């Protein structure tokens, strides 16, 4: 008992001496240790929590877009891209209100092989338009990872001049695995941009693929960016994408590459003469340019405007837009039916059951699909 008391007292004295800094005693003459300073709190205690901004109404969105408010336009595009049901409902109301103010722009789809310099080309051509008094919206579609579904959204960083231009609006969006590398909501975003007063819309796609029909079905002019020495000009491969193109530009025609670019230009022209005449009755032109040195950029824009004037004159421009509207009506119906089917509670349960039966080879894919569809339509 006595030992315990002594131990407690010893510990107390030790702690007391530590608190009073034993170094200040006479034994340590000449050495002084001051008491420490209490550190301020890591978080400001007087800081008030930032209040969350109230959600915008449909009227707020429409008014902001028509008044060319870029912040509200960006928020409206985010609303359109959202997958939440309440956001989708509000987005559709905003789009319907904006439709009467849309349809007055020139829509240009830009595609090409990876590394062809699409973003740099858009930066150069876009600055040419902005300097000429146009208002330009660029919808840059970035590829999404098939594994993580993520996207870098780095296209805007490569458009150094255009990204800070006053009359330019750049919106990078993930492709999210949609058809042709074009985000599903790009069509609706175009409507919002047109209502905001943009007279020219660029849609940059992920790259050349078999299903680039999506971008072709929402633009007035389809531009293919190519490089010299890729072999396409010799073999005539990627015939489908070349048949869709309303114009071809050989980029990076600078330095030691000028001669190769001119050779590729001649070979592409020869290849195009073997194709049937397009529905527009306007034979696609092939030009060379250097986006870095900004050579040939004005000729590219003249090619686009000449095409628009020609097709408006023969009625193809209006006919094509009507055909596109019909195409997107069916696409929207398909998407809504697909979403309705897969979000049905009964179908979700049955899908798991039939997946198990398929893996056990107890049922065929076609029988399983028919039973699921029958159940879905009977419940309706």
Q: What is the predicted role of each segment?
A:
Residues 57-111, 116, 122-211, 216-225, ...:
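Nucleotide-state-sensitive switch-loop elements of NTP-binding domains
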Residues 4-9, 14-100, 348, 352-353, ...:
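Non-catalytic terminal/linker segments enriched in charged/polar, low-complexity residues
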Residues 215, 230-259:
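Flexible active-site lid/hinge loop adjacent to a nucleotide/diphosphate
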Residues 200, 221, 246-247, 270, ...:
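Well-ordered beta-strand positions
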Residues 73-75, 288, 299-377:
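Long, well-ordered amphipathic alpha-helical subdomains in the mid-to-C-terminal portions
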